[in-house]
UniProtKB/Swiss-Prot annotation:
It catalyses: UDP-N-acetyl-alpha-D-mannosaminouronate + N-acetyl-alpha-D-glucosaminyl-di-trans,octa-cis-undecaprenyl diphosphate = beta-D-ManNAcA-(1->4)-alpha-D-GlcNAc-di-trans,octa-cis-undecaprenyl diphosphate + UDP + H(+). Pathway: Bacterial outer membrane biogenesis; enterobacterial common antigen biosynthesis. Belongs to the glycosyltransferase 26 family. CDD domains: Glyco_transf_WecG_TagA (cd06533). It comes from Yersinia pseudotuberculosis serotype O:1b (strain IP 31758). This is UDP-N-acetyl-D-mannosaminuronic acid transferase. It comes from the Bacteria. Catalyzes the synthesis of Und-PP-GlcNAc-ManNAcA (Lipid II), the second lipid-linked intermediate involved in enterobacterial common antigen (ECA) synthesis. It holds the Pfam family Glyco_tran_WecG. InterPro entries: UDP-ManNAcA_Trfase_WecG, WecG_TagA_CpsF. The lineage of its organism: Bacteria, Pseudomonadati, Pseudomonadota, Gammaproteobacteria, Enterobacterales.
Length: 246
Protein backbone atom coordinates (compact mmCIF):
# COMPACT_ATOMS: atom_id res chain seq x y z
CA UNK A 1 0.00 0.00 0.00
CA UNK A 2 1.25 3.48 -0.84
CA UNK A 3 2.63 5.50 2.09
CA UNK A 4 0.09 7.76 3.82
CA UNK A 5 -2.79 6.33 1.80
CA UNK A 6 -6.05 7.23 3.49
CA UNK A 7 -8.72 4.56 3.08
CA UNK A 8 -12.15 6.24 2.89
CA UNK A 9 -15.19 5.20 4.89
CA UNK A 10 -18.75 5.36 3.61
CA UNK A 11 -21.84 5.77 5.75
CA UNK A 12 -24.73 3.43 4.93
CA UNK A 13 -27.71 3.70 7.29
CA UNK A 14 -25.38 4.82 10.10
CA UNK A 15 -22.77 2.10 9.56
CA UNK A 16 -19.26 3.23 8.59
CA UNK A 17 -18.01 0.87 5.86
CA UNK A 18 -14.33 0.86 4.89
CA UNK A 19 -13.87 1.50 1.17
CA UNK A 20 -11.13 -0.99 0.39
CA UNK A 21 -10.05 -0.79 -3.24
CA UNK A 22 -9.15 -4.47 -3.48
CA UNK A 23 -7.97 -7.46 -1.45
CA UNK A 24 -4.32 -6.37 -1.60
CA UNK A 25 -5.18 -3.09 0.07
CA UNK A 26 -7.00 -4.87 2.90
CA UNK A 27 -4.05 -7.18 3.52
CA UNK A 28 -1.48 -4.41 3.34
CA UNK A 29 -3.46 -2.30 5.78
CA UNK A 30 -3.97 -5.08 8.32
CA UNK A 31 -0.75 -7.07 7.95
CA UNK A 32 1.62 -4.64 6.27
CA UNK A 33 4.80 -3.27 7.80
CA UNK A 34 4.90 -3.42 11.57
CA UNK A 35 2.66 -5.37 13.93
CA UNK A 36 -0.69 -6.81 12.85
CA UNK A 37 -3.48 -4.27 13.37
CA UNK A 38 -5.72 -4.95 16.35
CA UNK A 39 -9.50 -4.65 16.29
CA UNK A 40 -12.51 -6.52 14.96
CA UNK A 41 -13.40 -7.30 11.35
CA UNK A 42 -17.12 -7.58 10.54
CA UNK A 43 -18.48 -8.51 7.11
CA UNK A 44 -21.37 -6.28 6.10
CA UNK A 45 -24.13 -7.12 3.66
CA UNK A 46 -27.76 -6.10 3.32
CA UNK A 47 -29.04 -8.95 5.48
CA UNK A 48 -26.72 -8.15 8.40
CA UNK A 49 -27.52 -4.43 8.19
CA UNK A 50 -31.26 -5.13 8.39
CA UNK A 51 -30.75 -7.56 11.29
CA UNK A 52 -28.78 -4.90 13.14
CA UNK A 53 -31.51 -2.32 12.60
CA UNK A 54 -33.97 -4.68 14.31
CA UNK A 55 -31.60 -5.69 17.12
CA UNK A 56 -30.22 -2.88 19.28
CA UNK A 57 -27.59 -5.08 20.93
CA UNK A 58 -26.28 -6.40 17.60
CA UNK A 59 -26.29 -2.88 16.18
CA UNK A 60 -24.09 -1.68 19.04
CA UNK A 61 -21.72 -4.63 18.62
CA UNK A 62 -21.27 -3.94 14.92
CA UNK A 63 -20.88 -0.18 15.28
CA UNK A 64 -18.17 -0.69 17.91
CA UNK A 65 -16.12 -2.89 15.56
CA UNK A 66 -13.13 -1.18 13.96
CA UNK A 67 -13.37 -2.70 10.50
CA UNK A 68 -16.70 -3.04 8.71
CA UNK A 69 -16.12 -4.13 5.13
CA UNK A 70 -18.42 -4.62 2.13
CA UNK A 71 -18.85 -8.39 1.99
CA UNK A 72 -22.01 -8.36 -0.15
CA UNK A 73 -22.51 -6.96 -3.65
CA UNK A 74 -25.63 -5.23 -2.27
CA UNK A 75 -23.44 -3.15 0.03
CA UNK A 76 -21.02 -2.25 -2.76
CA UNK A 77 -23.85 -1.12 -5.03
CA UNK A 78 -25.47 0.86 -2.22
CA UNK A 79 -22.22 2.72 -1.55
CA UNK A 80 -21.68 3.44 -5.24
CA UNK A 81 -25.22 4.77 -5.53
CA UNK A 82 -24.86 7.07 -2.52
CA UNK A 83 -21.24 8.01 -3.30
CA UNK A 84 -20.86 7.95 -7.13
CA UNK A 85 -17.11 8.65 -6.95
CA UNK A 86 -16.44 5.75 -4.57
CA UNK A 87 -13.72 3.37 -5.71
CA UNK A 88 -14.23 0.19 -3.74
CA UNK A 89 -14.59 -3.50 -4.42
CA UNK A 90 -16.49 -6.28 -2.77
CA UNK A 91 -14.35 -8.14 -0.24
CA UNK A 92 -15.96 -11.54 0.28
CA UNK A 93 -15.45 -12.73 3.85
CA UNK A 94 -14.45 -16.26 2.83
CA UNK A 95 -11.86 -14.90 0.39
CA UNK A 96 -10.51 -12.43 2.94
CA UNK A 97 -10.09 -15.16 5.54
CA UNK A 98 -8.14 -17.36 3.11
CA UNK A 99 -5.99 -14.41 2.03
CA UNK A 100 -5.29 -13.53 5.68
CA UNK A 101 -4.33 -17.12 6.43
CA UNK A 102 -2.01 -17.25 3.42
CA UNK A 103 -0.30 -13.98 4.41
CA UNK A 104 -0.12 -15.13 8.04
CA UNK A 105 1.59 -18.32 6.90
CA UNK A 106 4.15 -16.34 4.92
CA UNK A 107 4.89 -14.03 7.84
CA UNK A 108 4.75 -16.61 10.64
CA UNK A 109 1.89 -14.72 12.30
CA UNK A 110 0.36 -16.71 15.21
CA UNK A 111 -3.28 -17.66 14.63
CA UNK A 112 -5.99 -19.06 16.95
CA UNK A 113 -9.14 -20.68 15.52
CA UNK A 114 -12.49 -20.72 17.33
CA UNK A 115 -15.76 -22.38 16.30
CA UNK A 116 -17.03 -25.05 13.97
CA UNK A 117 -17.67 -28.74 14.51
CA UNK A 118 -14.75 -30.70 15.97
CA UNK A 119 -14.10 -32.68 12.78
CA UNK A 120 -14.38 -29.61 10.55
CA UNK A 121 -12.04 -27.64 12.81
CA UNK A 122 -9.47 -30.46 12.75
CA UNK A 123 -9.63 -30.58 8.95
CA UNK A 124 -9.29 -26.80 8.78
CA UNK A 125 -6.16 -26.89 10.93
CA UNK A 126 -4.60 -29.68 8.89
CA UNK A 127 -5.30 -27.95 5.59
CA UNK A 128 -3.99 -24.58 6.80
CA UNK A 129 -0.73 -26.16 7.93
CA UNK A 130 -0.33 -28.21 4.76
CA UNK A 131 -1.31 -25.47 2.32
CA UNK A 132 0.24 -22.33 3.82
CA UNK A 133 2.25 -23.49 6.84
CA UNK A 134 0.07 -21.38 9.11
CA UNK A 135 1.43 -20.95 12.64
CA UNK A 136 -1.60 -22.21 14.57
CA UNK A 137 -1.08 -21.59 18.27
CA UNK A 138 -4.41 -22.96 19.47
CA UNK A 139 -7.99 -23.84 18.62
CA UNK A 140 -11.38 -24.50 20.17
CA UNK A 141 -14.45 -25.94 18.47
CA UNK A 142 -17.80 -24.26 18.92
CA UNK A 143 -19.04 -26.72 21.54
CA UNK A 144 -18.10 -25.07 24.80
CA UNK A 145 -20.31 -23.95 27.68
CA UNK A 146 -20.79 -20.40 28.97
CA UNK A 147 -18.86 -21.46 32.07
CA UNK A 148 -15.86 -22.35 29.90
CA UNK A 149 -15.67 -18.99 28.15
CA UNK A 150 -13.26 -17.25 30.52
CA UNK A 151 -10.90 -20.22 30.48
CA UNK A 152 -10.96 -20.03 26.67
CA UNK A 153 -10.23 -16.29 26.79
CA UNK A 154 -7.24 -17.07 29.01
CA UNK A 155 -6.02 -19.72 26.56
CA UNK A 156 -6.24 -17.28 23.67
CA UNK A 157 -4.33 -14.64 25.62
CA UNK A 158 -1.66 -17.12 26.72
CA UNK A 159 -1.21 -18.31 23.13
CA UNK A 160 -0.02 -14.88 21.99
CA UNK A 161 -2.22 -15.08 18.89
CA UNK A 162 -2.10 -12.02 16.63
CA UNK A 163 -5.14 -13.18 14.62
CA UNK A 164 -8.23 -14.86 16.13
CA UNK A 165 -10.92 -16.09 13.73
CA UNK A 166 -14.34 -17.02 15.11
CA UNK A 167 -16.82 -19.25 13.25
CA UNK A 168 -19.99 -19.17 15.33
CA UNK A 169 -22.50 -17.31 13.17
CA UNK A 170 -24.00 -13.90 13.87
CA UNK A 171 -24.59 -12.54 16.49
CA UNK A 172 -22.83 -15.19 18.61
CA UNK A 173 -19.43 -14.54 17.05
CA UNK A 174 -19.72 -10.77 17.50
CA UNK A 175 -20.62 -11.26 21.18
CA UNK A 176 -17.72 -13.66 21.65
CA UNK A 177 -15.23 -11.30 19.99
CA UNK A 178 -16.40 -8.34 22.07
CA UNK A 179 -16.04 -10.27 25.33
CA UNK A 180 -12.72 -11.87 24.40
CA UNK A 181 -11.26 -8.51 23.39
CA UNK A 182 -11.97 -7.16 26.87
CA UNK A 183 -9.78 -9.97 28.19
CA UNK A 184 -7.21 -9.92 25.38
CA UNK A 185 -7.22 -6.80 23.17
CA UNK A 186 -3.88 -7.47 21.46
CA UNK A 187 -5.17 -9.30 18.39
CA UNK A 188 -7.09 -8.88 15.15
CA UNK A 189 -10.46 -10.64 15.51
CA UNK A 190 -12.49 -11.79 12.53
CA UNK A 191 -15.98 -13.31 12.49
CA UNK A 192 -16.09 -15.90 9.72
CA UNK A 193 -19.48 -17.65 9.97
CA UNK A 194 -19.42 -20.90 7.99
CA UNK A 195 -16.05 -20.30 6.34
CA UNK A 196 -14.38 -23.38 7.85
CA UNK A 197 -17.10 -25.56 6.28
CA UNK A 198 -16.50 -23.98 2.87
CA UNK A 199 -12.70 -24.20 3.19
CA UNK A 200 -12.83 -27.93 3.96
CA UNK A 201 -15.38 -28.72 1.26
CA UNK A 202 -18.28 -29.58 3.57
CA UNK A 203 -20.31 -26.75 2.06
CA UNK A 204 -20.14 -25.90 -1.63
CA UNK A 205 -19.66 -22.28 -2.57
CA UNK A 206 -21.05 -20.71 -5.74
CA UNK A 207 -18.81 -21.13 -8.82
CA UNK A 208 -16.52 -18.17 -9.58
CA UNK A 209 -18.62 -17.03 -12.52
CA UNK A 210 -21.64 -16.60 -10.22
CA UNK A 211 -19.48 -14.78 -7.66
CA UNK A 212 -18.03 -12.43 -10.27
CA UNK A 213 -21.52 -11.58 -11.53
CA UNK A 214 -22.68 -10.73 -8.02
CA UNK A 215 -25.15 -13.62 -8.06
CA UNK A 216 -23.80 -15.75 -5.22
CA UNK A 217 -27.03 -15.04 -3.30
CA UNK A 218 -29.09 -16.47 -6.19
CA UNK A 219 -26.93 -19.60 -6.34
CA UNK A 220 -27.48 -20.18 -2.62
CA UNK A 221 -31.21 -19.62 -3.04
CA UNK A 222 -31.43 -22.16 -5.87
CA UNK A 223 -29.43 -24.65 -3.80
CA UNK A 224 -31.53 -23.96 -0.68
CA UNK A 225 -35.07 -22.84 -1.64
CA UNK A 226 -35.87 -22.56 2.08
CA UNK A 227 -33.84 -19.33 2.07
CA UNK A 228 -36.64 -17.57 0.19
CA UNK A 229 -38.04 -15.99 3.37
CA UNK A 230 -34.64 -14.54 4.19
CA UNK A 231 -34.34 -13.15 0.67
CA UNK A 232 -37.80 -11.58 0.76
CA UNK A 233 -36.79 -9.61 3.85
CA UNK A 234 -34.14 -7.92 1.71
CA UNK A 235 -36.88 -6.08 -0.18
CA UNK A 236 -36.68 -3.53 2.63
CA UNK A 237 -33.07 -2.79 1.63
CA UNK A 238 -34.16 -2.48 -2.00
CA UNK A 239 -36.62 0.14 -0.79
CA UNK A 240 -33.81 2.05 0.91
CA UNK A 241 -31.78 1.84 -2.30
CA UNK A 242 -34.41 3.27 -4.63
CA UNK A 243 -35.90 5.81 -2.22
CA UNK A 244 -32.60 7.50 -1.42
CA UNK A 245 -32.65 6.44 2.23
CA UNK A 246 -29.21 4.85 2.27
Amino acid sequence: MEPNTVIPKYNVRGFEIWGFRDMAQVLDHLLGSGPVKTGTLVAMNAEKLLKAEDDTALCELIKNAEYLYADGISMVRAIRRKYPQAELSRVAGADLWEALMQRAGQQGTPVFLVGGKPDVLAETEAKLRAQWNVNLVGSQDGYFTPEQREALFARIAASGAAIVTVAMGSPKQEIFMRDCRKFYPDALYMGVGGTYDVFTGHVKRAPKIWQNMGLEWLYRLLAQPSRIRRQLKLLKFVGYYYSGRL
